[in-house]
Amino acid sequence: MKNSSIVLASASPRRSELLESAGIQFRVVPADINEEPLPGEEPVDHVQRLAEGKARAAAELAEGRFFLGADTIVLCDGEIMGKPKDAVDAERMLKKLSGVPHEVVTGFAIYDRERKGAVVEAVRTKVFFKHLRDEEIRDYVATGCPFDKAGAYAIQGGAAHMVRKIEGSYTNVVGLPLCEVVDALRVIGALGN
């Protein structure tokens, strides 16, 4: 699965690690775009729009043929949770997630410069948190881990003990639905098979 024409439009170390774990060769060219939701925008439309925007923005910055963009949010009781603004926001998010199921939604887009088109998908995973004590939340926030993660937690890190179960893709919760991304890369010819 080697192909140097794949560009990851993300600075996320977790997304890089996931692609590396699949044996995919790629370069990283982070793309910075406005991530504010549009008025009335549905969550799935939001992450898909941002993913495609990041992929196309990276194509303006770098050589290559295939540009992979992604965006992840957490949905809980109708609230779209991105990355927390500060410790108070992180604690608020974790208190809201405590003891209730929520969804992690990742949109990804693979922009093909040669064909001037993109494959855009979204994957949803249901996550069930245990009830969290205030002390647990404060201790976790104090580690600094929540600040660059949607919903203020990392399932693969210090928040693993908070999760009772998931329904769907584990790698989606980490930040990139690897099965679906690899399948899409293969279908559009980015992996050469």
UniProtKB/Swiss-Prot annotation:
Keywords: Cytoplasm, Hydrolase, Nucleotide metabolism. Pfam families: Maf. One of its GO terms (biological process) is nucleotide metabolic process. The active site is at 71 (proton acceptor). The record marks 14, 72, 156 as: Important for substrate specificity. InterPro entries: ITPase-like_fam (IPR029001), Maf-like (IPR003697). Its cofactor is a divalent metal cation. It comes from the Bacteria. It catalyses: dTTP + H2O = dTMP + diphosphate + H(+); UTP + H2O = UMP + diphosphate + H(+). One of its GO terms (molecular function) is UTP diphosphatase activity. Its EC number is 3.6.1.9. Nucleoside triphosphate pyrophosphatase that hydrolyzes dTTP and UTP. May have a dual role in cell division arrest and in preventing the incorporation of modified nucleotides into cellular nucleic acids. This is dTTP/UTP pyrophosphatase. The lineage of its organism: Bacteria, Pseudomonadati, Thermodesulfobacteriota, Desulfuromonadia, Geobacterales.
